[in-house]
Design a protein with these regions (language model features):
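Surface beta-strand/loop "capping" patches
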Residues: 97-128
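N-terminal carbohydrate-binding accessory modules
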Residues: 106-110, 164, 176-239, 258, ...
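A short, polar/charged loop-to-alpha-helix boundary motif
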Residues: 35-46, 196, 218-225, 275
Length: 433
């Protein structure tokens, strides 16, 4: 029930799986085929009173979905992916009544960690033409600053009494922005991330990343993870003295990133993909979806200081020309959206990759002693050092002798509760060894 008229409405979808079509009072207002991606749809003018908002959500992979108006085969989430394609809503759904011109958000970028100088990029929606009068202030400032800005325009200013964001001291600041009829509050941290030779630098100082990969998946809740479970995961990481988590293999929930901001947990955020073939990456529709979902991920999470790495398409066929061209396209798109962070992807073609040379960081997935053939008479743990040495040698010789490296995946899987005194594969004993 809407209590008043409004010239516009915006339907905000946190994330769905795998496709969804939305109607308002029988009229279609939006469609998404990008799982785990936050989406927004304009509804047009809204009258006071009752309305029927309907959603058809489908996690079929094949053409059966076209019967229900869901398009052709699912392009970006395929049956062979090694995690389940849950159906339904993963995150929040909300309908907002807004004015003809609204402030969508303000992107905050650190310019100088010594002075607290930041760049504010103002983004409006609806009628965005011309200048917009804004009032803004940082943290608990009493007085507002004023300016007239156009859509996409950037202002530079200094945050008073600023403190840097670091894993040890995750200091956060707020920016409150008002227009004539709208208001947004952005939370951000002042910090920089860069590389210096083989090192990753946070605020100009080397940082050594120690952490785990993490999925949004639970036997009871699926991909709709409650806040308490997110918090428990971060507590466990903290107890293990970790400072880094890789969100795999899709854009992360904003609630989780909020917690990481507060915990001081550094984050690798990547767009959806897993083992994608050269044929897929040569498909123009697939390329368009990958670029769009990656751009949306960056826009959604750009103000989170915890995010230091953007990534895409886990374990794609990076040894092929389509893989290289896909990498070129994604890196270009990410740098257009956000030139301040590092870009990578998790590579499993560790002896023939040609795409990692485009990245800021070389990242690789290896499973010596678990996946693949095993030398006779060699214990699985003993396979790790020579495999590591061979991988590093290839990348240093063929990609870069002077880029940071991340072991993005390594180890082996175990099935909870499966035991064997002989420590056979998939047992907890084999995994622990």
């Amino acid at each position: 029930m809407l209590r008043k008229d409004s010239p516009r409405g915006i339907l905000k979808i946190g994330a769905t799986g795998l496709r969804a079509r939305f109607t308002l009072d029988g009229k279609e207002i939006g469609f998404t085929n990008m799982p785990y991606t936050d989406m927004e749809f304009e509804t047009g003018a809204l009258k006071a009173g009752r309305h029927v908002l309907a959603a058809a959500v489908d996690n079929n992979f094949d053409k059966l979905s076209s019967t229900f108006g869901m398009g052709d085969r699912m392009k970006i989430f395929l049956p062979y992916y090694d995690f389940y394609g849950f159906g339904g809503f993963y995150r929040g759904v909300s309908l907002h009544q807004v004015f003809e011109s609204t402030i969508d958000r303000v992107q905050v970028r650190t310019l100088c960690i010594k002075t607290g100088k930041v760049a504010l990029r103002f983004l409006f929606s609806g009628k965005t033409e011309g200048k917009h009068a804004v009032r803004f202030r940082f943290n608990t400032e009493e007085a507002f600053r004023t300016a007239e800005v156009a859509h996409g325009e950037t202002l530079e200013c200094t945050v008073p009494e600023f403190r840097l964001w670091t894993p040890e001291a995750p200091n956060l600041h707020t920016l409150e922005v008002h227009t004539e009829n709208d208001c947004v509050v952005e939370r951000f941290g002042i910090r920089t991330v860069s590389t210096g030779g083989k090192q990753i630098l946070l605020n100009g100082k080397p940082v050594y990343l120690k952490g785990f990969n993490r999925h949004e998946s639970h036997p009871e809740f699926g991909a709709a993870t409650p806040d308490a479970l997110m918090l428990e995961d971060l507590q466990n990481l903290r107890d293990l003295n970790c400072n880094f988590v890789r969100g795999c293999h899709y854009a992360q929930d904003q609630r989780f990133l909020d917690l990481c901001d507060e915990f001081g947990m550094l984050v690798w955020d990547e767009s959806l993909g897993w083992g994608n073939s050269a044929e897929q990456m040569a498909d123009p529709e697939f390329q368009e979806i990958v670029e769009r979902e990656t751009r949306l991920m960056v826009r959604d999470s750009i103000n989170h200081p915890c995010v230091i790495i953007w990534a895409y398409l886990n374990e794609n066929n990076s040894q092929t020309e389509p893989g290289f061209r896909m990498g070129e396209r994604v890196v270009k798109a990410v740098k257009e959206e956000d030139p301040t962070r590092l870009v990578t992807f998790a590579c499993n073609h560790t002896l023939d990759d040609i795409t990692s040379k485009l990245m800021d960081i070389i990242s690789y997935n290896i499973y010596p002693g678990w996946i693949g053939s095993h030398p006779v008479g060699v214990e699985p743990p003993d396979e790790i050092p020579p495999f590591q040495e061979k991988t590093i040698e290839y990348f240093r010789k063929n990609v870069s002798a002077d880029k940071p490296m991340i072991v993005s995946e390594m180890g082996c899987c175990g099935i909870y509760g499966q035991h064997d005194i002989a420590a056979t594969q998939w047992t907890e004993e084999f995994q622990a060894e």
